């Protein structure tokens, strides 16, 4: 009983530390960001289309739009591929192929974001610049690399959800005359829908919060993009690019951007 009580105390302490960390982050963000937002004006801050710190003009609407567009592009690129890969690994791949691909997915998850950004800078940006409109550093380049970066999250969570579906569901579908593909997509996938959706949501959170790779390839123009070939600046990129030299209201506006980003992720 003493060991059990000690274990419970340890688990409770770990949970308390996690809760305290989240609470402290919230307190820091809101205590420093909300006053700046109030001073600027909520409407001017959220819907303003100009970001000019030198003139004390802080409108983050272009960054909000940029974050939404980049995340939407990442979802379009990464979610279908990740979902189909998860289905293949869970229900179609043999043991050898499945193990090899699973190791590859784990490797993707461990690659630093700066390496992804360097890859996009060396591959995607020149390709877009030489074959498509624009200068290469664009919303399209950011969306492509973000789509690749969310693949491990989507694949891993979706595969776990598919693996957790009881075998009797699949066997029952076969007993009713369905073939393998129909049993998988008609019975197993719907049964795992909540877990697959969780993987997609986690992938979206990863895309919204990603910074370094986006900074390297997005162009970082603080304007609303006119097309996928235009440069774009996300909220995270805005914070990283300017926090090093920001002061006073400028610094508060950047922390306020963090508040908006925090609400987005929630």
Predicted regions and their residues:
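Cytoplasmic-entry segments and transmembrane alpha-helices of multi-pass inner-membrane transporters
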Residues: 8-9, 81-120
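Generic hydrophobic transmembrane alpha-helix motif, especially the helices
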Residues: 106-147
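Hydrophobic positions within alpha-helical transmembrane segments of bacterial inner-membrane proteins
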Residues: 20, 67, 71, 75-83, ...
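Periplasmic/extracellular loop-to-transmembrane helix junction in inner-membrane transport proteins
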Residues: 2-10, 30-74, 94-95, 241-252
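Amphipathic cytosolic juxtamembrane alpha-helices at the membrane-cytosol interface
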Residues: 4, 81, 85, 89, ...
